[in-house]
Swiss-Prot record:
Domain Toprim: 80-175
Name the UniProt record assigns to this protein: Recombination protein RecR
A single MF term (Gene Ontology): zinc ion binding
One example of a Gene Ontology biological process annotation: DNA repair
PANTHER family, alphabetized: RECOMBINATION PROTEIN RECR
Organism: Lactococcus lactis subsp. cremoris (strain SK11)
Function, in words: May play a role in DNA repair. It seems to be involved in an RecBC-independent recombinational process of DNA repair. It may act with RecF and RecO.
Zinc fingers classed as C4-type: ranges: 57-72
Keyword tRNA processing recorded: no
CDD domains: TOPRIM_recR (cd01025)
Keywords annotated in UniProt: DNA damage, DNA recombination, DNA repair, Metal-binding, Zinc, Zinc-finger
The family this protein is said to belong to: Belongs to the RecR family.
InterPro entries reported in the protein's UniProt record: DNA_Rcmb_RecR, Rcmb_RecR, Rcmb_RecR_Znf, TOPRIM_dom, TOPRIM_RecR
Length: 198
């Protein structure tokens, strides 16, 4: 189907977003065109601001406006526990349940032999360094229940256990192949409560 070039480019831009197919991208493009100029400008400004103003925390790797992030600098957090997640969105999901009061570490991905992603290509080295220089007694591995998530969890357990640090894994309620981001708060709460040592 033919669209004027500005619409075609907008559709193409929307279709690059995860989970957005051609049909949804087209719908979003036409919706955006119908928006008031002020709303479009605010949307564009917010996109640019998020891209420009956010950075990764130098301690945990979470997205933040200030470095170190608010979680790492919060004196009320339990500094003896670190919960390891794949992405920053997983930190948000865990914070929603309000059960976990420790620190986090964001890997920015998983080990994936099939995709050629090795431990050196995710945020593992800084975790190991962090563990050697801290009072951490337990690392909770909260990678997704996928083959890559499991491979990453096993690798991390092998790296961390020799240091005498307890390594646990989220438990009950997370189906194999599921993403933490999409789990409901009760399921996540139970998974943290019933974590298993690995």
């Amino acid at each position: 189907m033919y669209y004027p070039e500005p619409i075609a480019r907008l559709i193409e831009s929307f279709s690059k977003l995860p989970g957005i197919g051609q049909k949804t991208a087209t719908r979003l493009a036409f919706y955006t065109i119908g928006m008031e100029d002020q709303d479009v400008n605010e949307f564009a400004k917010n996109l640019l601001s998020a891209k420009r103003d956010l950075r990764f925390c130098s301690i945990c790797g979470n997205l933040t406006e200030s470095d170190p992030c608010a979680i790492c600098t919060d004196p009320t957090r339990d500094r003896t526990t670190i919960l390891v997640v794949e992405e920053s969105k997983d930190v948000l999901a865990m914070e929603k349940i309000r059960e976990y009061r420790g620190l986090y570490h964001v890997l920015h991905g998983t080990i994936s032999p099939m995709n050629g992603i090795s431990p050196d290509e995710i945020n593992v080295k800084s975790l190991i360094t962090r563990l050697m220089d801290s009072e951490v007694k337990e690392v909770i591995i909260a990678t997704n229940a996928t083959s890559d998530g499991e491979a990453t969890a096993m690798y991390l357990a092998r790296m961390i256990k020799p240091a005498g640090i307890k390594v646990t894994r989220l438990a009950h309620g997370l189906a194999v192949g599921s993403d933490i981001e999409y789990a409901d708060e009760v399921t996540l709460s139970k998974a943290v409560e019933n974590r298993l040592e690995i």
